[in-house]
Amino acid sequence: SISYILEMNADNINLDGKIYTQRIDLTSKNEINTLKDAIVSVSDNAALKALSLNNKAFFYVGNKLTSNVNSIVNNANLQTNSIEFNDLKNLVNTGLLLSQEDLSIITDKFENKANAYLLSGKNLTLATSGNGNSFNNAGNIIANSALTVDVKNADATNSGILQAIAKDLKLTAKNVNNTGAIESGLGI
């Protein structure tokens, strides 16, 4: 379906078809699920409010994606111009999470699985907060500019790639367990 503004409000939202719209506002009491064959293409802004977002689709936002979601599991392709994920309880990425501009994530628990990509065209800030927080990266976390990983109350486990291409990489953690690559200022 094609529309200018698409608003949905339901106990659960399951998207399995194709959605093309200028703006989208999805509000669910429980879950927002995008299924494997779905396409969600938003040319401007998207706002998501739910207990959890489970993305298995191609989900594109042309401008800014904001969320009031407790948990995000990205198993596919989530792309936008700018992302702010604040006050998450859990973020698990097994796919591609891409921001053309800045990417900011604040979550209690973060896991970027092997072969997963968390990419930012500019600055990428990833922080953990709360009790029982954790940071595990087995994939690729790459910022075209600066990369800040602030997990000062938790251990940072990296078996993948942490990379700031053009600027500084700042990693603050209780303990750092690195068997992967940590690279900054390569100017590639």
Report residues per predicted region:
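Short, T/G/N/S-enriched strand-turn elements that build extracellular solenoid repeat scaffolds
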Residues: 1, 14-20, 34-41, 54-60, ...
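Surface-exposed loop/turn motifs in large extracellular/passenger domains
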Residues: 2-11, 22-30, 42-51, 62-70, ...
